[in-house]
C-alpha cells in the first residue's frame, strides 16, 4: 500500500468518525433543549402547586443535569474540531505528495527571497512553489523560519547534519507523535487570542509575541516595597482594633484604617491591569499547555534522541504544569475581586491584590526565563517534524552519505522533488577529482537547467538533514553557489549583463577564499547577456579561472565551442542532453549522456512554430 493509499484510507476513517460525532452532538443538543424547557415548566408547575422551596430544588437538580450534559456536549464538539483538523492535516499530506500547491498552507508574503544569497532564488528554496513550502508543516512562525534557515545553510556542518538525520529517522517512524504534535499546535493557534495571536495574515502563528509581552510586562517597578508598607499598615490596623476591643488603647483604629485605605488607593495604579494581565497570560499559556503538556508527559524510552530535545519540558521543578498550577492559584486569589463583599473583607485584612500581583511579577520572571527554552524546543521539533514528514511521504528517498576523505558528489537516479513523479526523469551523475567541471550542452528545453536545479535542491535537502530524491547519494561538504536566474534591477540601475557579471564575480571570489569548504557551483548560460564573440572569450577565461581552484560544478551552455575546453583543461568533461523530431514534434527523453551534444534545435523550433528560417 502506497503512502497515498494509506492517507486516503485514514481520511475515510476520520470522516466516518465525524459522522458518528455529529449524530452524538445532535442528540446532546436535543437533550439540552429538552432539559431546559422541561426545567422551566417543572419549576413553574412546582412553584404553583408545591411551593417555592420545592420549585427551587427541582430547578437546581435540572440545572445540574443541564450542566453535566453541556460538559459532555462540549467534549464531543471539541472532538469534532480535532477530527476536522486531523482530516485537514491528512489532506495537506496528500497535497504535498501530489504537489497540489493551491491546497498547501499559505506563505508569509512579507518574507522576500534574498537576491544576494548564494542559491535561494535560483533553486526556488523559498516562495510560492518552493522547497520550503513543500516541506513546511510548522504552525509557528519561528518553527517555519528555523526550517528555512536549515534549507538555506551556506556552510554545512557534518556533525550537525548527521545529528539531524538521526532525529529525522527517529521521528519518521512515529507518525502518531508527529500528527498529534501538529494537531495540538493547530488547536493552540486557533484557540489563542489576545497577546499571543498572530495578526500578520500568514498561516503561521508568531509565538514570540507572547515572549515579548511577558518581558515588557516584567520590566515594571517592583511592588515589594509597597507590599511591605501596606502590610505594616494593615497589621497595625488589626492590632489597634484588637487592643481597642480589649480597652487597652483609645479608638484610633479608624484613623489607621483610613491611612491604610488611602495608601492603597494612592498606589492602586501599580496594579490596575494585573487582573486582565493575569487572565491574558493564563489563557495564552493554557493553550501552550496543549503542546507542552503532551511533550512533558510523553514517554521517550524508544526515542532517546527526541528525549534530549524535549528535556526542558521534563526538568524537575521547571515543568509547564507547575507554572500552570501557580497561575491557577493566582487566578483564584485575584478572582476574589469579582465578589464585592468578599473582596472588601480580604482587603480590610491585608493588601490582597498588591500581594498577589507581586507574586504574579515573580512568576512572570520565572516564566520569562523558562518560556524561551520551551519555545525553542517546540520550534526545533516543528522543523524536525517537517523533515520527518517529508521523509515519511517519500519512502523511496534516501539519506545521503557524507564523506570527508575527498571532494566528491555522486548520485544514482537523482530527481527533482518539485517535479511530479509522472513527469520526472532521474539521472546518474558524479563530480570528483577527475571530473571537477562539467560543460553541459544540449538543445533548448532538453533539461539542462532542470539538472542544475536538481543537484542544488538535493544538496539543500542533504545539508538540512533531510532525505534526497535519489536511490543513492554520496557527497562531501560544499559551499553551494548558483548563477541561474539572474535578472536586471531598475531600482539598482543594473542591466541584465551587469547583474550577471556581478553574480559571477561573487561566485569566483568565493572560490578564491581560503576556506576549508570548496565551492560547488551551478551556472546556467554563462554570459548570455552579451554578443556571441565576447561571450565565448569571457566564458573560456572564466572557466579557466574556476579550474585553478579547488571548486567543482556544472556550466550549462549553448556555446558548442566551449566543449573544446575538455581537451585543454584537466578535470573538464562534457555531458549533454539531446532531442529527436518525430512527426513534426520535438521529443525529449531528458537522459543525461556523456560527451558533447551532437545536435541543436533552435532552427527546428523556429520552423515548427512557423517562423521564417534561411537555409544554412
Could you describe each region identified by the protein language model?
Residues 1-443, 450-480, 502-503, 513:
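Alpha-helical coupling/stalk and coiled-coil linker elements that connect catalytic or binding modules
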Residues 69-70, 257, 266-267, 387, ...:
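ATPase nucleotide-binding head domains, primarily ABC-like/P-loop NTPase cores
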Amino acid at each position: 500500500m502506497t503512502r497515498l493509499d494509506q492517507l486516503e484510507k485514514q481520511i475515510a476513517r476520520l470522516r466516518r468518525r465525524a459522522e458518528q460525532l455529529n449524530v452524538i452532538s445532535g442528540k446532546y443538543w436535543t437533550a439540552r433543549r429538552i432539559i431546559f424547557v422541561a426545567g422551566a415548566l417543572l419549576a413553574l408547575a412546582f412553584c404553583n402547586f408545591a411551593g417555592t422551596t420545592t420549585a427551587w430544588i427541582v430547578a437546581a437538580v435540572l440545572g445540574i443535569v443541564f450542566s453535566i450534559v453541556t460538559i459532555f456536549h462540549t467534549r464531543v464538539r471539541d472532538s469534532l474540531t480535532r477530527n476536522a483538523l486531523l482530516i485537514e492535516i491528512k489532506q495537506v499530506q496528500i497535497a504535498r505528495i501530489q504537489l497540489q500547491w493551491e491546497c498547501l498552507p499559505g506563505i508569509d508574503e512579507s518574507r522576500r527571497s534574498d537576491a544576494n544569497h548564494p542559491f535561494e532564488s535560483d533553486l526556488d528554496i523559498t516562495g510560492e512553489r518552493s522547497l520550503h513550502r513543500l516541506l513546511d508543516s510548522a504552525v509557528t512562525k519561528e518553527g517555519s523560519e528555523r526550517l528555512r534557515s536549515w534549507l538555506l545553510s551556506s556552510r554545512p556542518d557534518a556533525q550537525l547534519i548527521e545529528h539531524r538525520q538521526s532525529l529525522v529517522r527517529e521521528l519518521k517512524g512515529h507518525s502518531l507523535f508527529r500528527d498529534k504534535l501538529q494537531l495540538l499546535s493547530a488547536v493552540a493557534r486557533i484557540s489563542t487570542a489576545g497577546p499571543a495571536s498572530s495578526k500578520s495574515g500568514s498561516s503561521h502563528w508568531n509565538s514570540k509575541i507572547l515572549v515579548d509581552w511577558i518581558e515588557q510586562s516584567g520590566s515594571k517597578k517592583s511592588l515589594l516595597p509597597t507590599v511591605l508598607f501596606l502590610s505594616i499598615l494593615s497589621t497595625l490596623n488589626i492590632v489597634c482594633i484588637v487592643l481597642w476591643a480589649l480597652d487597652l488603647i483609645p479608638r484610633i483604629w479608624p484613623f489607621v484604617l483610613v491611612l491604610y485605605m488611602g495608601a492603597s488607593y494612592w498606589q492602586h495604579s501599580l496594579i490596575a491591569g494585573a487582573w486582565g494581565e493575569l487572565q491574558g497570560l493564563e489563557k495564552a499559556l493554557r493553550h501552550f499547555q496543549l503542546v507542552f503538556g503532551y511533550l512533558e508527559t510523553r514517554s521517550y524510552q524508544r526515542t532517546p534522541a527526541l528525549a534530549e530535545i524535549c528535556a526542558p519540558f521534563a526538568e524537575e521543578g521547571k515543568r509547564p504544569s507547575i507554572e500552570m498550577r501557580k497561575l491557577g492559584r493566582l487566578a483564584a486569589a485575584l478572582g476574589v475581586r469579582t465578589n464585592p463583599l468578599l473582596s472588601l473583607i480580604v482587603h480590610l485584612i491585608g493588601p490582597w491584590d498588591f500581594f498577589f500581583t507581586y507574586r504574579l511579577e515573580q512568576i512572570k520572571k520565572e516564566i520569562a526565563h523558562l518560556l524561551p527554552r520551551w519555545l525553542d524546543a517546540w520550534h526545533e521539533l516543528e522543523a524536525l517534524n517537517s523533515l520527518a514528514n517529508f521523509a515519511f511521504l517519500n519512502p523511496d528517498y534516501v539519506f545521503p552519505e557524507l564523506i570527508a576523505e575527498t571532494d566528491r558528489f555522486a548520485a544514482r537516479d537523482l530527481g527533482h522533488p518539485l517535479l511530479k513523479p509522472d513527469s520526472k526523469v532521474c539521472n546518474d551523475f558524479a563530480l570528483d577529482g577527475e571530473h571537477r567541471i562539467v560543460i553541459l550542452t544540449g538543445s533548448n528545453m532538453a533539461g539542462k537547467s532542470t539538472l542544475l536545479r536538481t543537484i542544488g535542491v538535493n544538496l539543500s535537502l542533504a545539508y538540512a538533514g533531510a532525505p534526497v530524491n535519489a536511490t543513492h547519494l554520496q557527497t562531501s561538504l560544499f559551499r553551494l553557489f548558483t548563477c541561474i536566474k539572474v535578472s536586471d534591477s531598475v531600482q539598482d540601475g543594473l542591466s541584465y549583463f551587469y547583474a550577471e557579471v556581478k553574480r559571477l564575480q561573487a561566485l569566483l571570489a568565493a572560490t578564491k577564499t581560503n576556506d576549508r569548504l570548496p565551492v560547488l557551483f551551478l551556472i546556467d548560460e554563462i554570459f548570455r547577456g552579451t554578443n556571441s564573440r565576447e561571450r565565448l572569450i569571457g566564458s573560456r577565461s572564466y572557466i579557466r579561472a574556476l579550474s585553478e581552484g579547488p571548486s567543482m560544478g556544472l556550466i550549462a551552455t549553448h556555446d558548442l565551442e566551449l566543449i573544446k575546453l575538455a581537451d585543454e583543461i584537466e578535470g573538464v568533461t562534457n555531458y549533454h542532453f539531446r532531442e529527436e523530431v518525430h512527426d513534426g514534434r520535438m521529443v525529449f527523453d531528458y537522459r543525461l549522456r556523456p560527451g558533447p551534444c551532437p545536435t541543436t534545435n533552435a532552427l527546428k523550433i523556429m520552423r515548427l512554430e512557423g517562423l521564417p528560417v534561411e537555409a544554412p
